[in-house]
Amino acid sequence: MNFKKLPKIELHCHLDGSLRVDTILDIAKKDNIPLPSYNKKELINYVSIMDDCNSLDEYLNKFFIPNKVMQTKENLKRIAFELLEDVAADNVKYIEVRFAPLLHVEKGLNIEEIIESVLEGIKEAEKLYDIKGNLILGCMRNMDIPSAFEVVKKGSKFIGKGVVAIDLCAGEEPHFPGKYIEVLKLAKECGYRITIHAGEAGVGENVLEAITLLNAERIGHGIYIKNCAEAYKLVKEKNIPLEVCPTSNLHTKAFESYETHPFMDFLKDGIKVTINTDNMTVSNTTITKELEMLNKFCGLSIEDYKILYLNAVEASFASPETKEILKSYANEITA
């Protein structure tokens, strides 16, 4: 089955986890940014999972170097443009790029400049390629609560101009949603859609609380609902889409193999799952690679993929007009 030729949708892709290694090298040389190595083969080991990774926290260490080259307007615009260029080459028709603006203030940029630069890169790529993109703003759970309010408030002026949603990301502690009730209440009032990283690192109850306390419309990962019957039931009853990222889940040791990943069980039980990369560079993956692995190890069929694709259309935060265009591509999904 040629998954490369099929239309695709990406709902969970981190900008700072999806840079070209060549671009990291190029910017580092241009801006005099120190790197542990300027040899591409050696540098890959610092920004990608090559052999083994023991935890989510270890996985997150791979973002340190990419963020060093994402501190100017020019670089942010370029990196956003290149991401859309890369996924368009993989026949992705729509992508929701997510990033945390406060990771890019080291050289004095303000939040508005940071968001604007990324949006410019997205819009430039849209003009050249058959792809549409939107932006999800991330609030870092390892920063203080006032910083989350700052992102919500300052990012709100871009709602309707390319920004569609708010997210909570970084390491996952049990019962984190309770700390962010007021932040997400404000986000909802501002008009953001809401997707929350939860149930990625062993705590299924976080998914339950993300939905009940934070009004999450989608869940990033959510795989540990398998260990929390109440969360599983709520996700199924409310038809909450899960942004599943299989290779990333293997890298963070959520599961030992594709065969033991609960994705197919969720799909067969009617859970609204979507397939995503999480971080193309860190996990050395693409949507096509994800689908090929699921086909090889889990028996993913063309019929299954059509369900996944239409799930992603429905789950997306795209405009009604864009959703209609995306639905029309489903006719191309044939073996």
Swiss-Prot record:
InterPro entries the record matches: A_deaminase, A_deaminase_dom, Ado/ade_deaminase, Metal_Hydrolase
Catalytic residues (UniProt): E200
Catalytic EC class: hydrolase
Cellular component annotations (GO), alphabetically ordered: cytosol
Free-text cofactor note: Binds 1 zinc ion per subunit.
UniProt: Zn(2+) binding residues: H12, H14, H197, D278
Key word NADP present: no
Residues annotated for substrate binding in this entry: H14, D16
Entries under SUPFAM superfamilies matching the protein: Metallo-dependent hydrolases
An annotated GO BP: inosine biosynthetic process
Cofactors, names only: Zn(2+)
Sites annotated Important for catalytic activity: H221
EC nos: 3.5.4.4
GO molecular function: 2'-deoxyadenosine deaminase activity; adenosine deaminase activity; zinc ion binding
Catalytic activity: adenosine + H2O + H(+) = inosine + NH4(+); 2'-deoxyadenosine + H2O + H(+) = 2'-deoxyinosine + NH4(+)
UniProt entry keywords in alphabetical sequence: Hydrolase, Metal-binding, Nucleotide metabolism, Zinc
Keyword flag Ribonucleoprotein: no
Function description: Catalyzes the hydrolytic deamination of adenosine and 2-deoxyadenosine.
Family to which the UniProt record says this protein belongs: Belongs to the metallo-dependent hydrolases superfamily. Adenosine and AMP deaminases family. Adenosine deaminase subfamily.
Identification of the protein by name: Adenosine deaminase
Annotated gene: add
